[in-house]
């Protein structure tokens, strides 16, 4: 059966309808759809049925059940009447428009990325690494060099250190004069011409303990070859 646009069924869409079935039950709900077999779809539907008492003295009572969305078969339908007009919000778009301002309860997409104008978090001062180009070795030190260049630089540094004059603290005078050549110390006779002056004690040896073994004291001839020199003061000579 073809349903025309002028059908009475189309005029009752979204109305509250009362539908009575063959078994006496009553369904009241919002009429949403139908077909040529008179199968109906009701939303927000309530069921009302009358329960007969067991005793004749008791009155017949009515029971109500909330069903929700219901599909009624047309073969069980007896009558269909209008219960009330459609709701006032019928036809209003429930999807928010693109230009409309969102209110509470409207879902919004989660933000992606960092919003503009928000400062980036920075690490504490003790945990932050050095700034690029600051706090590390210079670029000249990190530049790779050949073996000859490194050796020449090391030799130049050693020569500059060895040739630098030694500075002594003020108030203590200059370095002692070299021993072995030049004028003898006061209190000693000069050696005859053509004879080397005796060697003094080595540098750093405390005075008063004599000369080391093998070197005679000043003014004394050295022992002949193959013979030991005199023992130092305070030491007994070896037994024969």
Curated annotation (Swiss-Prot):
> What PTMs does it carry?
Methylated by PRMT5. Arg-108 and Arg-112 are dimethylated, probably to asymmetric dimethylarginine.
Major localization class:
cytoplasm
Q: Which residues carry this modification: Asymmetric dimethylarginine?
A: 108, 112
Region feature (Repeat-rich region):
175-236
Annotated ranges, domain Sm: 4-86
Region Disordered: what ranges? Answer: 161-240
Question: What's in the keyword line of the UniProt record?
Answer: Cytoplasm, Methylation, mRNA processing, mRNA splicing, Nucleus, Repeat, Ribonucleoprotein, RNA-binding, Spliceosome
UniProt biased composition (Pro residues): 172-205, 214-240
Q: Looking at the UniProt record for this protein, which Gene Ontology cellular component terms does it annotate, in alphabetical order?
A: cytosol; methylosome; nuclear speck; nucleus; SMN-Sm protein complex; U1 snRNP; U2-type catalytic step 2 spliceosome; U2-type precatalytic spliceosome
Q: Where in the cell is it found?
A: Cytoplasm, Cytosol; Nucleus
Q: Which residues carry this modification: Omega-N-methylarginine?
A: 108, 112, 147, 172
Q: Does the keyword Repeat apply?
A: yes
> According to the record, where are the sequence repeats?
175-181, 191-196, 216-221, 222-228, 230-236
Q: GO MF annotations for this entry?
A: RNA binding
For this protein, the record's Pfam families field holds:
LSM (PF01423)
Tagged with keyword Acyltransferase: no
Q: Which Gene3D superfamilies does the UniProt entry name for this protein?
A: 2.30.30.100
Q: Which residues carry this modification: Dimethylated arginine?
A: 108, 112
Name the source's superkingdom: Eukaryota
What are the recorded Gene Ontology BP terms?
mRNA splicing, via spliceosome; spliceosomal snRNP assembly
Family named by the database record? Belongs to the snRNP SmB/SmN family.
SUBUNIT field: Core component of the spliceosomal U1, U2, U4 and U5 small nuclear ribonucleoproteins (snRNPs), the building blocks of the spliceosome. Most spliceosomal snRNPs contain a common set of Sm proteins, SNRPB, SNRPD1, SNRPD2, SNRPD3, SNRPE, SNRPF and SNRPG that assemble in a heptameric protein ring on the Sm site of the small nuclear RNA to form the core snRNP. Component of the U1 snRNP. The U1 snRNP is composed of the U1 snRNA and the 7 core Sm proteins SNRPB, SNRPD1, SNRPD2, SNRPD3, SNRPE, SNRPF and SNRPG, and at least three U1 snRNP-specific proteins SNRNP70/U1-70K, SNRPA/U1-A and SNRPC/U1-C.
**What is this protein for, i.e. what is its function?**
Plays a role in pre-mRNA splicing as a core component of the spliceosomal U1, U2, U4 and U5 small nuclear ribonucleoproteins (snRNPs), the building blocks of the spliceosome. Component of both the pre-catalytic spliceosome B complex and activated spliceosome C complexes. As a component of the minor spliceosome, involved in the splicing of U12-type introns in pre-mRNAs. As part of the U7 snRNP it is involved in histone pre-mRNA 3'-end processing.
Q: What is this protein called?
A: Small nuclear ribonucleoprotein-associated protein B'
Q: Specify the species.
A: Notamacropus eugenii (Tammar wallaby)
Q: Which gene encodes it?
A: SNRPB
């Amino acid at each position: 059966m073809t349903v025309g646009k002028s059908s009475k069924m189309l005029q009752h869409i979204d109305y509250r309808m009362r539908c009575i079935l063959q078994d006496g039950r009553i369904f009241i709900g919002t009429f949403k759809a139908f077909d040529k077999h008179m199968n109906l779809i009701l939303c927000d539907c309530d069921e009302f049925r009358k329960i007969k008492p067991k005793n004749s003295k008791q009155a017949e009572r009515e029971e109500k059940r909330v069903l929700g969305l219901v599909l009624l078969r047309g073969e069980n339908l007896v009558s269909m009447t209008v219960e009330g007009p459609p709701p006032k919000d019928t036809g209003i778009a429930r999807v928010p428009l693109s230009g409309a301002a969102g209110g509470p309860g409207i879902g919004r997409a989660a933000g992606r990325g960092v919003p503009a104008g928000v400062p980036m978090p920075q690490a504490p001062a003790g945990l932050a690494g050095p700034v690029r180009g600051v706090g590390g070795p210079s670029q000249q030190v990190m530049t790779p060099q050949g073996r000859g260049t490194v050796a020449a630089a090391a030799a130049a540094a050693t020569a500059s250190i060895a040739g630098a004059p030694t500075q002594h603290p003020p108030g203590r005078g200059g370095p002692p004069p070299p021993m072995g050549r030049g004028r003898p110390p006061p209190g000693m006779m000069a050696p005859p011409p053509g004879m080397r002056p005796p060697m003094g004690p080595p540098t750093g040896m405390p005075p008063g303990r004599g000369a080391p073994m093998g070197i005679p004291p000043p003014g004394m001839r050295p022992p002949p070859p193959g013979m030991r020199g005199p023992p130092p003061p305070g030491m007994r000579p070896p037994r024969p």
